[in-house]
Design a protein with these regions (language model features):
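Multi-pass membrane proteins that catalyze or facilitate reactions on polyprenyl-/lipid-phosphate substrates
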Residues: 1-173
């Protein structure tokens, strides 16, 4: 849905792989990957136990604080996301791999706290998800192939879930 809703930006990235936007996505992706490598054991075990409610609480505090922060701040017009903002948003995305922490919520909050414009930060946040989703899918496929395990999948259910997620995603963005 991100690829469709933000197709103009996606085409810019494809046509100009060394543009500022493309470089900003790389800057955001690197810290996310590094944090995931460090936190991976915690991520895989955190669906159980006390960490989930703590992460929900962190998300709630971030969203409430960002809402207050944005209402009481005037933003300077900027041409786009700075590399510093991309780095900060990438760090937030890395920690958002913990269950209970909203990826888009935390990256948008990080972008706003670092002085970004709400609309630009939101678009960049959604674009940031694309490389991470692709890398995550590649990692999971690699693990399945390496282990030689291919779970049985309800294809019809998967197609329905994909279509619903796609439609809701496009409408939401």
């Amino acid at each position: 849905s991100v690829l469709v809703a933000l197709r103009k930006e996606v085409f810019e990235i494809v046509r100009h792989p060394f543009s500022r936007l493309s470089k900003s996505l790389v800057v955001a992706t690197i810290p996310t990957c590094l944090i995931v490598l460090v936190l991976y054991p915690l991520i895989t075990q955190s669906f159980e136990g006390a960490i989930l409610p703590i992460c929900f609480l962190i998300t709630a505090i971030l969203l409430l604080t960002a809402d207050f922060f944005v209402k009481h701040k005037t933003f300077v017009h900027s041409p786009g996301i700075s590399y510093k903002q991309a780095l900060i948003m990438g760090i937030a995305q890395g920690f958002a791999t913990l269950p209970g922490i909203s990826r888009s919520g935390s990256t948008i909050c990080a972008g706003l706290f670092s002085g970004g414009d709400r609309e630009k930060v939101a678009k960049f946040s959604f674009l940031m998800s694309v490389p991470i989703i692709i890398l995550s899918m590649a990692l999971e496929i690699f693990k399945l192939v390496r282990l030689g395990e291919f779970p049985s999948v309800n294809v019809a259910g998967l197609i329905v879930a994909f279509i619903l997620a796609f439609v809701i995603g496009v409408v939401s963005i």
